[in-house]
Amino acid sequence: MNLAAMDPQTYDAQLEHKRIKLEQAFAQFETPSVEVFASEPANYRMRAEFRMWHDGDDLYYYMFDKVLNEKVRCDQYLPASVLINQMMSALIAELKPNPSLRHKLFQVDFLSTLSGEILVSLLYHRQLDDQWRTNAAALKAKLSSQFNVNIIGRARKQKIDLDKDFVVESLQVNDKTFLYKQIENSFTQPNAKVAVKMLEWAIDVTQDSQGDLLELYCGNGNFSIALAQNFNRVLATELAKPSVEAAQYNIEANGIKNLQIIRMSAEDFSDAMAKKRSFRRLEGIDLDSYVCNTIFVDPPRAGIDPDTLALVQGYERILYISCNPDTLKDNLEQLYKTHRVTQFALFDQFPYTDHMETGVLLERTQ
């Protein structure tokens, strides 16, 4: 974290620097001009994590500034949503005078939504007892007069949910509203308004699609649910059990009838498609019945492994969302042999940092 860089007055200049850097890095692939999707310059992050500092009777949030090499007190946090900033003030006022709730509290995590829900996770270096549960329930009741809030307590090998461990986000994407269950301690897009722009872009560049869609690394179904309208059927894979459960919830909540989620890794699915191995999880699923002309991938920062990349390269169209331009560039070295980039986008999920979220659409040339 570099707090000095978080200046809304310099946001446009910082984003332009990213655009230039991205275009230069990918010039060898003869990409079209980068389409840039900006963030709000403040209050854009829907989740935030803070360490807690105990100083006598005082208690406050802090982060570590890697540039200054020191901890920085954070009574408010410019990148965090307005809802998180409001909760930060209300929560600390309740924690300070409560020994049971503040004792050995070392971290607080917030997960908020555009729909107005917020989840607060309190992390401790001690086991939580009945007294903690009673006090936490009273805290939730007090905060509920101002917020739609749920509270979770965490300690080593211990988790206490007072009610539920998730929020339900509501995203307005073009003329449709999509509901997404987001589970505590699972991956979600941190910048909800930019996430909407990503969904709208993906829908736009695939609107003339034929046949079915295959998605790898689908998470909670964020993209596959929104893209289902453009395809006959969608087959999606995800390994993490909580994400798969959230995806099934989201499929039902959004009334999606043409999407099937398989819980398995991209690597295993690649083996299944290549007929190298058979998997019990694929029993009853006729992979050969899918006519997937388009594949969608949103891999982790490490990019796509070689076997999966070979699978991806076999499709006519490849929609690739990347959170790491370096590994995207590495993967394009191979994909560029058979495909050309027809759409190129920069989504500023992480203002005031060097991180760049990118999207490319590749179409087969041979």
Swiss-Prot record:
Entry keywords, A to Z: Methyltransferase, S-adenosyl-L-methionine, Transferase, tRNA processing
Keyword Transferase: yes
One GO CC annotation: cytosol
Top EC class, one word: transferase
Catalytic activity of the protein: uridine(54) in tRNA + S-adenosyl-L-methionine = 5-methyluridine(54) in tRNA + S-adenosyl-L-homocysteine + H(+); uridine(341) in tmRNA + S-adenosyl-L-methionine = 5-methyluridine(341) in tmRNA + S-adenosyl-L-homocysteine + H(+)
Cross-referenced PROSITE patterns: SAM_MT_RNA_M5U, TRMA_1, TRMA_2
EC number(s) recorded for this UniProt protein: 2.1.1.-, 2.1.1.35
Disulfide bonds: none
Keyword check for Iron: no
Chain positions recorded as S-adenosyl-L-methionine binding sites: 189, 217, 222, 238, 298
GO MF annotation list: rRNA binding; tRNA (uracil(54)-C5)-methyltransferase activity, S-adenosyl methionine-dependent; tRNA binding
One of the protein's GO biological processes: tRNA methylation
Catalytic residue positions: 323 (nucleophile), 357 (proton acceptor)
Functional note: Dual-specificity methyltransferase that catalyzes the formation of 5-methyluridine at position 54 (m5U54) in all tRNAs, and that of position 341 (m5U341) in tmRNA (transfer-mRNA).
The family this protein is said to belong to: Belongs to the class I-like SAM-binding methyltransferase superfamily. RNA M5U methyltransferase family. TrmA subfamily.
NCBIfam families recorded: trmA_only
HAMAP family xrefs: RNA_methyltr_TrmA (MF_01011)
Protein name, per record: tRNA/tmRNA (uracil-C(5))-methyltransferase
Organism: Shewanella putrefaciens (strain CN-32 / ATCC BAA-453)
